[in-house]
């Protein structure tokens, strides 16, 4: 890891930790904390983070597919830390196989900024389940996801390689197009099944299919 990378990760990753802590302190727990849903969310997000497929000149992961129902599966204050931990778990196999150094797992915090925006929007709107959340709020949550992710990425890339915001937008527009296409599928799974546990399980075969076509 270069000096610029260390500065970027401390800045962006540290900012995420601060934001997640602020959310946890200010956003009320809309339902009780249960171990099984938290573990299910953790596992689903970790599995999704392992699925990579090419998009334009880069790649993306379909994590938004399960992230949407996770927003309604566990209390909102837990979504950000669970997301960051899941990304770390998703990177463990690569560490074990020697593909990446253990220090790369610390990138998980900076890569989890996309979770902050939707949490804030849903908490502000008082949303507790997919069925009763207004469509405009859902669109706002998706937009907030893109905004916080782009903001964090822009800061990171500015520090590392001096990239402009315009260059960042050009790089991620295809990634966000994929996210925009997958998010409604995750929402549909949450809408048609009143039990969010099964909503996530229903999406696992699709993740497997995406993984198959990505190889």
Residue locations for each model-derived region?
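Short helix-perturbing small/polar motifs within transmembrane alpha-helices
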Residues: 1-59, 65-170, 174-179, 183-212
């Amino acid at each position: 890891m270069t000096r610029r990378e260390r500065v970027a990760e401390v800045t962006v990753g540290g900012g995420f930790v601060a934001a997640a802590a602020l959310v946890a302190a200010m956003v009320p727990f809309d339902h009780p904390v249960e171990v099984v849903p938290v573990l299910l969310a953790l596992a689903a997000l970790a599995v999704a983070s392992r699925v990579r497929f090419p998009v334009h000149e880069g790649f993306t992961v379909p994590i938004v597919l399960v992230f949407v129902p996770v927003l309604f599966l566990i209390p909102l204050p837990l979504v950000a830390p669970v997301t960051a931990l899941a990304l770390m778990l998703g990177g463990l196999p690569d560490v074990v196989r020697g593909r990446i150094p253990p220090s790369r797992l610390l990138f998980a915090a900076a890569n989890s900024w996309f979770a902050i925006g939707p949490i804030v929007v849903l908490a502000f709107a008082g949303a507790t389940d997919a069925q009763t959340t207004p469509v405009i709020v859902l669109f706002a949550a998706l937009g907030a996801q893109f905004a916080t992710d782009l903001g964090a990425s822009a800061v990171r890339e500015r520090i590392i390689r001096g990239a402009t915001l315009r260059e960042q937008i050009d790089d991620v527009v295809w990634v966000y197009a994929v996210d925009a296409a997958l998010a409604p599928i995750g929402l549909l799974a949450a809408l048609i099944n009143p039990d969010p546990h099964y909503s996530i399980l229903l999406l696992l075969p699709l993740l497997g299919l995406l993984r198959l076509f990505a190889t």
